[in-house]
Design a protein with these regions (language model features):
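N-terminal signal peptide c-region/cleavage motif recognized by signal peptidases
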Residues: 14-16
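A metal-dependent hydrolase signature that marks the N-terminal structural subdomain at the beginning
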Residues: 20-101
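Second-shell loop/turn segments in exported
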Residues: 65-73, 128, 132, 161-166
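Auxiliary, metal-adjacent structural segments of Zn-dependent hydrolase domains
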Residues: 71-121, 126, 181, 185-187
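Post-HExxH zinc-binding segment in Zn-dependent metallohydrolases
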Residues: 91, 154, 164-197
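Short pre-active-site segment immediately N-terminal to the catalytic Zn-binding motif
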Residues: 112-114, 122-143, 165-167
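Catalytic Zn2+-binding segment of zinc metalloproteases
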Residues: 132, 146-163
Length: 197
């Protein structure tokens, strides 16, 4: 089943839910209807729309990154970096920068990145946090966002956006998995150290 509806806010091509006559496929663009189009044509259309969505996301990321960089960024806080060194190559940790509170960038991220509860957004190598507390204390969130920095490094911006528009869950799942792993490790570390005195 294609995920086109996730790409362009409701424009989609889905597997047949309603029976279409022979030689027709269900096409959904605001409403669903049967059209005399082959599965091969649907795949070509899907690829074209997917490429347009990826290109738009790529341009937004590049422009947003430049805007964020121009207004100033900071390196990863040392206490955060020290806790994440076991999880990341030095190249990821050295490349990543951050800033706090750019509401306009985060607002666009809510729309562009299909995630209504964004706490941070990674603009290639710049992580924009919604609030300063997360930037200074949320090691698990840092782990999540740094995985995206690593993905950008491995794939490049164009390939990242292509993959993201095709299946954003496949991009986010490993980041959420690592976020949970780091949170558990931190809780275990606190439990082993005992109560504060």
């Amino acid at each position: 089943m294609f995920r086109l509806s996730a790409l362009l806010g409701g424009l989609g091509l889905a597997a047949s839910v309603l029976a279409c006559p022979s030689g027709q496929q269900q096409v959904c663009a605001v409403v669903c209807f049967c059209a005399p189009i082959s599965q091969a044509d649907i795949e070509v259309l899907y690829e074209d729309v997917s490429q347009m969505a990826a290109s738009g996301l790529e341009q937004w990321l590049l422009q947003s990154r430049e805007t964020a960089a121009a207004s100033g960024t900071l390196p990863i806080p040392l206490h955060i970096r020290a806790q994440l060194e076991p999880y990341y190559d030095i190249g990821v940790l050295d490349a990543a920068r951050y800033k706090v509170g750019d509401g306009e960038t985060l607002g666009a991220a809510n729309t562009m990145l299909q995630n209504p509860d964004v706490q941070a957004v990674t603009l290639i190598d710049i992580i924009v946090f919604r609030n300063a507390a997360d930037a200074q204390d949320n090691v698990a969130l840092w782990a999540h966002e740094l995985l995206h920095v690593q993905q950008y490094q491995q794939w490049g911006v164009r390939e990242f956006t292509r993959r993201y528009t095709r299946d954003h869950d496949a991009i986010e799942a490993p980041a959420y998995k690592l976020q949970i792993e780091v949170a558990r490790a931190l809780r275990a570390q606190v439990a082993q150290s005992g109560p504060a005195r």
